[in-house]
Design a protein with these regions (language model features):
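Extracellular glycan-modifying ectodomains
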Residues: 1-274
Length: 274
């Protein structure tokens, strides 16, 4: 049985947690792979675990889920997992562009309010005291609206995917119900799109159920996307039942919020963000 995990870092994390490192992983971000190479590889697999990848992704028609389905073996079993995301915990998180390119220093993720503080001449202490540690920064109703908006969007995408990718060999893993039932009880994400081990465990269990494989492979101790943990604002605390003070941020081997903020401010000074 040959299995391919095809997609973003979430697929790579699932492969590791399932202890399936002997099976292949192709990152959909990799534009170096040629169409011919991908076609030659796809025909080898009995099972492909993937996610919805748009047509003409990164200006390459062959990186899409549609292309994968068209060129895999006819009897290949396909499992399509949600592109997992949730805005609730890190509602201020964003991607930033500078000089027409995504700004990936000091990391992929940036904080809108931190950038506004920097641009307005407010120092790091102001950002931490008035935003990060301000339990009243966002009202609980507004935060729960954010959670519900993400859940509705996950459901909308799931229903659209079922209409787009059709076949008796195609199966889906939907994460919205699990997130809705659990997001207040345990931390399910380290960024808006890096799930914690709890959500990855649910997806792994769902995959094994669909494959009718006994659950003897999942590494429940592994937390594969935990190397970077974003800053969670204290206003989240009234909305959840777990202690967010135990959910420390992590970046470049530091858990200190001030040190993490300094990394960002140094980059913004360097590029003269305005």
């Amino acid at each position: 049985m040959h299995i391919l995990f095809y997609g973003n870092c979430q697929q790579g994390a699932l492969r590791r947690m399932l202890n399936m490192l002997k099976h292949d992983y192709i990152c959909c971000h990799n534009t170096d792979i040629t169409e011919t190479d991908l076609v030659n590889q796809l025909c080898k697999y009995d099972i492909i675990i993937t996610q919805p990848i748009a047509d003409n992704y990164r200006h390459k028609s062959y990186l899409s889920t549609k292309f994968v389905l068209e060129h895999c073996k006819k009897d290949c079993k396909i499992i399509i997992v949600d592109v997992i995301y949730f805005d609730f915990y890190y509602f201020d998180l964003t991607y930033t562009h500078f000089n027409n390119s995504r700004l990936t220093k000091p990391g992929d993720y940036h904080y809108t309010c931190m950038q506004e503080c920097y641009k307005n001449g407010n120092n790091i202490s102001y950002y931490i005291n008035n935003i990060v540690n301000n339990i009243h920064f966002k009202h609980t109703d507004e935060l729960e609206d954010t959670a519900n908006n993400s859940l509705r969007e996950l459901k909308r995408r799931y229903e659209a995917n079922k209409k787009t990718y059709i076949g008796s060999n195609i199966h889906f893993v939907y994460t919205g119900d699990y997130i809705r039932s659990n997001y207040k009880h345990k931390l399910l994400f380290y960024s808006m799109n890096h799930p914690s081990k709890y959500l990855l465990q649910f997806v792994c269990e769902s995959i094994l159920d669909l494959l009718d494989i006994p659950n003897t492979t999942i590494n429940y101790d592994m937390d594969p996307l935990s190397s970077t943990k974003c800053i969670m604002y204290k206003c989240i605390q009234p909305c959840v039942f777990f202690d967010i003070m135990k959910c420390e941020p992590a970046m470049y081997q530091t858990n200190n919020i001030k040190d993490i903020c300094e990394l960002y401010y140094n980059v913004y000074n360097e590029i003269q963000l305005c």
